[in-house]
Amino acid sequence: MSGPLTERRQTILKLVIQEFVDTATPVASETLVRKYRLPVSPATVRNDMAALEELGFLTHPHTSGGRIPTDTGYRFFVENLMERTSLSPAEQRMIRHQFYQVRGELDQWVQLACAVLARTAHNASVATAPRAEQLRFKSLELISIHETMALAVIVFHGGIVKQQTLPVEPWRTPEDLRRAAGLVSDLLADATLTRVEELATAATFNGIPLSDFERGLVDLVVRAMIAFEEQAQEQIYSDGLLEMLSQPEFSPASGRDDAERVIERMRRTLEILKSGRGLGPLIPQALASGGVQVIIGGEHGEDTMRDYSVILARYGVEGVIAGVLGVIGPTRMAYPRSISTVRYIASLMNNLLAELYNVQARPSEGESEYKDEQHA
């Protein structure tokens, strides 16, 4: 019988995970007793490790007498044994400085977030482009660039701008274009996509009949809003492929797996980072959550993700704009470091976007622990 998960067995489980994360080799009882000066014999530790294996927290490769953690073991560690850590003040200052060097550039912020996550957590990283939760129209400007061509500059709240050329009749003057753009701007002021689509059928505005040209401008705005939402849904940034492939799990020389399985794991890693395959259901879950999500190995429910753990967090401004960022790596992951890195980058992105949108940032899970350092 395996017996209860006693305090000593919890300590042994924690040490096995720490040792395995550090060395990537199965952990023997003698190693734990010697390295951590445990006040019990190797035989006692061996019995406890056997009990932990019966309970489903540990397993052992057929070629080794040592044990390694299972997904269940990692889950228990994350939820019950892991010590919560923070990035050092020096790391926070360095990261914050990098972000403020590209202040106000959304795409650059997301790409930088991926780069910093990968470098700091020593694994691959992913992030979705921030998507307006309620994309709202702000203004339309028409600029004459030729007697039969104009540039439409469509501005949405939050600094999102879309530009598109459109044909115009040669008799339309710049003043005609300005007047039409002003009328459409007033008609669609602060409207969401749903409202813009409703207004697209309007025949008049404030008693003034809308011309075919003006209704065409409304249709142009509708298409721009739809295109933006579709693009935001599909756009996934990634970084850190080399960081991830440097792990022993991707080296045939480590002896952990044969070359064929290692190559297959590399192929799946490339596919995940390139297309986001396997992350599909995780993104909406993270967007709906206010905290850090940790998904370990087989918990994904997808065979392609069985060897990976994913740590994700939502970032953005509540009710305005939001995205998801996080790290991907082997289940043998330094969870405290990875979680604290994801949490800090998400809180930093919250603050940057709140400044951009001129609103008060809503603290995310664990954000208060960074408050003093961010304003140091």
Curated annotation (Swiss-Prot):
Q: Which GO terms describe its molecular function?
A: DNA binding
The source's domain of life comes to: Bacteria
Q: Tell me if Repressor is a UniProt keyword of this record.
A: yes
Q: Name one GO biological process term.
A: negative regulation of DNA-templated transcription
Q: Which UniProt keywords apply?
A: Repressor, Stress response, Transcription, Transcription regulation
Pfam families reported in the protein's UniProt record: HrcA
Tell me which positions the record assigns to the signal sequence. none
Q: What does this protein do?
A: Negative regulator of class I heat shock genes (grpE-dnaK-dnaJ and groELS operons). Prevents heat-shock induction of these operons.
Q: Which PANTHER family match?
A: HEAT-INDUCIBLE TRANSCRIPTION REPRESSOR HRCA (PTHR34824:SF1)
What's the family?
Belongs to the HrcA family.
Q: What is this protein called?
A: Heat-inducible transcription repressor HrcA
Originating species? Chloroflexus aggregans (strain MD-66 / DSM 9485)
Species classification: Bacteria, Bacillati, Chloroflexota, Chloroflexia, Chloroflexales
